[in-house]
Regions:
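Class I S-adenosyl-L-methionine
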Residues: 1-277, 309
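Class I SAM-dependent methyltransferase "Motif I" SAM/SAH-binding loop
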Residues: 282-286
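Conserved SAM-binding loop of SAM-dependent methyltransferases across substrates and taxa
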Residues: 287-297
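Short, conserved SAM-binding/catalytic segment
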Residues: 294, 313-316
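Conserved SAM-binding motif I beta-strand of class I
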Residues: 299-303
Length: 316
């Protein structure tokens, strides 16, 4: 019951009902109806326990993501929806049609006006995600050229001292008095078009002095040189392709519904600070508690199965 306050956590208070052999499998006697009822009860209870700055994450497959989203909209309110994060899997069930390789992570806030959020970043590496548009190189001699196919693939070393760069847009859709002006460059007077430049006249002169300006022939406008090290990180977005649930020798999959540790880690880091309290109402083997402990969060983990509780207790 949601309002029940006399819950005990001693050994004698755990259920004495016979355990199923499939201790880590989800089983629903009435199918979708059982699942929906289970979800509503636990989400309502979870919302009651959340801090005003708190978040809730629900990982789910494509079969029921639409049902779960509808239920969470009802319990938390549509206005408190934050994101649906796509989680890449390495395998999919055999099917006659297109293979499904994504799970979904639904993210809601208790109060979106107060929710705690900490932006995470990836390191921007040449040739990797977030850096594929860096296709030119600035050599110590002053020569600037396009990277070769072998250099782009990493099959050939980059010249020593070379700096990889891309040509980036210097115009903005917004327009103000300080950014709407014509600029004389390489014998031409060029304007920003219907919008404005991304910087003022002082900034343009600074870019020119640093050798950062280039003329774009298509569109007859000015671009600027952005080196890959200018901002060596890219913000984490809602497509996670490096959290494959296929697992490997370093992180073997031991249970049917086991979650990749990296997913849990990111959720904790995005939505909490050290000292905050993390709750996992479907304990399993205790992965969430272990990650929370590693990152200095307090934690509570619970499960209806004595098998899960016993394994988690030994692990932790």
């Amino acid at each position: 019951e949601i309002s029940k306050r006399d819950v005990k956590d001693k050994e004698g208070d755990l259920t004495r009902e016979p355990e199923m052999v499939k201790a880590y499998r989800d089983s629903w006697y009435l199918g979708t109806h059982s699942y929906a009822s289970y979800l509503v009860d636990r989400l309502r209870c979870g919302r009651e326990m959340l801090a005003e700055t708190g978040s809730i994450f629900l990982q789910i497959g494509e079969e029921n993501v639409h049902r779960a989203r509808q239920i969470m909209d009802e319990v938390f309110g549509e206005e408190n929806f934050i994101s649906t994060i796509a989680l890449l899997k390495t395998t999919s069930n055999t099917t006659r049609f297109i293979a499904g390789v994504y799970d979904h992570l639904l993210w809601y806030a208790k109060d979106i006006r107060q929710v705690k959020y900490r932006q995470l970043y990836f390191q921007k590496d040449f040739g990797a995600e977030g850096a594929l548009e860096y296709t030119q190189i600035d050599l110590p001699s002053g020569e600037k050229r396009a990277l070769s196919i072998l250099e782009k693939r990493g099959a050939s070393d980059l010249p020593e001292g070379g700096r990889v760069f891309r040509l980036d847009n210097l115009t903005s859709q917004s327009r103000s008095a300080s950014t709407a002006f014509s600029y004389f460059w390489e014998g031409k007077t060029l304007g920003p078009g219907a919008g404005g430049w991304k910087t003022n006249l002082v900034g343009m002169n600074r870019l020119a002095a640093a050798g950062r300006l280039r003329t774009r022939q298509i569109g007859n406008t000015i671009t600027y040189v952005r080196y890959i090290e200018d901002f060596a990180a890219i913000p984490l977005a809602n497509m996670w392709t490096d959290v494959s649930s296929g697992f490997n020798v370093y992180q073997p999959k031991l249970y049917v519904v086991q979650t990749n540790e990296r997913i849990v880690e990111r959720c904790i880091l995005m939505a909490s600070d050290p000292g905050d309290l993390v709750l996992d109402p479907t304990c399993g083997s205790g992965t969430t508690a272990e990650i929370a402990e590693q990152w200095g969060r307090r934690w509570i983990t619970i499960d209806t199965s004595r098998v899960a509780v016993s394994i988690a207790r030994q692990r932790l």
